[in-house]
């Protein structure tokens, strides 16, 4: 699911690392196009979109934590607006890092964002998600994930959209 602030984040990552957005192998975890996609930011790329259910822009139905591609199979691995819905977000992130040879980035809901995409709230916003929902913080990621494989990385927060953003270069 896309929203304007998250798309602006992806645009900023593309502006910072333009070489990773043309003629690369790209894996997107959580690619179901509900109201927009990051796929359009990539030019002349081999692009694999993965999500837990079928739909527009989903090339493979699978869970991010279970993907078994070889280490460093992709130049870019991304996930936008999914981790807050995934009880296995740590395993998914670690798997994304393992499969990337270069750029990893994600966006997800952080403190202040209302619960969404659950049967309790708006099930059509995330049709394959279950009951789990957790807004994540930079501290959650730092305490649960090993960031040592990145040469450079950064976190940022959009306080209006209540989004947490991360990019890292291996």
Regions found by a protein language model. Give the residues of each.
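Conserved SAM-binding loop
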Residues: 24-114, 166-169
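Class I SAM-dependent methyltransferase Rossmann-like catalytic core
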Residues: 1-20
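N-terminal/domain-start segments enriched in small and hydrophobic, helix-friendly residues
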Residues: 17-26, 126-130
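Short N-terminal micro-motifs specific to bacterial/archaeal maturation
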Residues: 1, 17, 58, 80-83, ...
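S-adenosyl-L-methionine-dependent methyltransferase catalytic module, highlighting the catalytic core
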Residues: 87-99, 103-170
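Conserved phosphate-coordination/catalytic loops
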Residues: 4-8, 83-87, 135
């Amino acid at each position: 699911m896309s929203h304007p602030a998250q798309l602006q984040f992806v645009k900023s990552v593309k502006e910072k690392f333009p070489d990773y957005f043309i003629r690369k192998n790209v894996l997107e975890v959580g690619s179901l196009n509900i109201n927009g996609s990051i796929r359009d930011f990539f030019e002349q790329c081999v692009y694999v979109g993965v999500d837990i259910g079928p739909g527009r822009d989903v090339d493979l139905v699978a869970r991010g934590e279970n993907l078994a591609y070889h280490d460093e199979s992709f130049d870019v691995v991304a996930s936008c607006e999914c981790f807050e819905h995934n009880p296995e977000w740590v395993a998914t992130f670690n798997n994304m890092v393992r499969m990337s040879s270069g750029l990893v980035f994600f966006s997800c809901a952080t403190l202040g964002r209302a619960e969404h995409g659950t049967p309790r709230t708006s099930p059509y916003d995330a049709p394959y998600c279950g009951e789990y929902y957790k807004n994540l913080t930079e501290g959650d990621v730092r305490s649960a994930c090993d960031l040592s494989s990145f040469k450079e990385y950064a976190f940022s927060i959009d306080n209006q959209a209540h989004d947490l953003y991360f990019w890292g270069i291996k």
